[in-house]
Amino acid sequence: MLKTTLLFFMTALCEIVGCFLPWLWLKRGATAWLLVPAGVSLALFVWLLTLHPAASGRVYAAYGGVYVCTALLWLRFVDGVRLSLYDWSGALIALCGMLIIVAGWGRA
């Protein structure tokens, strides 16, 4: 379970970075060269999703829970926004959903 969660976390970071770099280019006028590492990051994101032993739809559903938590960590530490009780509650619910789905991988 820990290995799966860490792999999902790495996957989420790749997805967020791959989307954040073009955002910097479009919204903040950063160099278009950021699109190169963004493309690499998104390709790595896709590859990491293929490393899980479950059906793709089940992997995507479980990944969503970790993505929510990772995005909120990004909000806190990159964007500098303090998380609310609603943020923490939503993250906990999403993570519980992920844990339930992953726990059932071998039983489905």
UniProtKB/Swiss-Prot annotation:
* Transmembrane annotation, as ranges: 6-26, 29-49, 61-81, 85-105
- Topology with respect to the bilayer: Multi-pass membrane protein
Q: Which domain of life is it from?
A: Bacteria
The record's annotation in InterPro entries points to: UPF0060
Which keywords does this Swiss-Prot/TrEMBL entry list? Cell inner membrane, Cell membrane, Membrane, Transmembrane, Transmembrane helix
- Compartment list: Cell inner membrane
Q: Name one GO cellular component term.
A: plasma membrane
- Family in the record: Belongs to the UPF0060 family.
| HAMAP family, per database record | UPF0060
Query: Can you say what this protein is called?
Result: UPF0060 membrane protein CKO_01576
Q: Which organism is it from?
A: Citrobacter koseri (strain ATCC BAA-895 / CDC 4225-83 / SGSC4696)
